[in-house]
Design a protein with these regions (language model features):
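Short, solvent-exposed polar/charged micro-motifs at secondary-structure junctions
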Residues: 11-15, 56-58, 120
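C-terminal edge-of-domain segments
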Residues: 81-182
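Residue-level preference for beta-strand/loop junctions
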Residues: 9-11, 72, 125
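Short beta-strand segments
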Residues: 1-30, 46
């Protein structure tokens, strides 16, 4: 999620991102409402979320508990600049390579599967951006305010669930040893 500061408040867009060192690259449809905002105020906040899961108060041994949500997220903030056309094409190649590897054993998609004219036409419909990350902050809520036995109990219940978010949070809770992740 990319957030810019519009004249009437925040403007939000969902976009695939690539982070390398302190640089975050992404692209948006040229028609996206965030594009003129970033042109006028070239600074953005990117929010990347990890696994998350609902925690039932019934899972605690202690009485008088409330429901909660455990999660992992990272925020990156900094100035953005519009990429040149050749840089945007490279970004698309890099994004495809990054995500296509997870689809193996299918052969990865590359722009070589498109006619150059069609690729160029589609490239003209997007705007690529590069953010220089000046601030990077992570937030975790993994029940670290609870005693170790309660954390273990909640992690065990989450691990029994079928959704990836619950299982991911359970693994992080077990790995953090009750301290959170920083």
């Amino acid at each position: 999620v990319i957030v810019g500061s519009g004249p009437d408040g925040p403007v939000v867009a969902h976009a695939p991102v690539l982070l390398a060192a302190r640089t975050l690259r992404f692209h948006l449809s040229a028609a996206n409402a965030l594009c003129p905002v970033l042109r006028e105020r070239p600074r953005a906040l990117a929010v990347v979320t990890g696994p998350d899961a609902y925690v039932s108060p019934d899972w605690y041994a202690a009485a008088d508990q409330v429901p909660t949500w455990n999660y992992l997220s990272v925020e990156a903030e900094g100035p953005v600049r519009v990429l040149q056309r050749v840089e945007t094409a490279a970004l698309l190649d890099d994004l495809a390579a990054h995500f296509e590897v997870g689809l193996a054993p299918k052969p990865p998609w590359t722009r070589a599967k498109m006619t150059p004219a069609r690729f160029e036409a589609m490239l003209g419909a997007i705007v690529g951006y590069k953010m220089r990350v000046e601030r990077l902050a992570g937030t975790t809520k993994l029940s670290q305010n609870k005693p170790p036995d309660e954390i273990a109990r909640v992690a065990a219940r989450l691990a029994e669930r079928l959704d990836e978010g619950s299982r991911g949070i359970a693994a992080l809770m077990n790995a953090s040893d009750g301290r959170g992740l920083g």
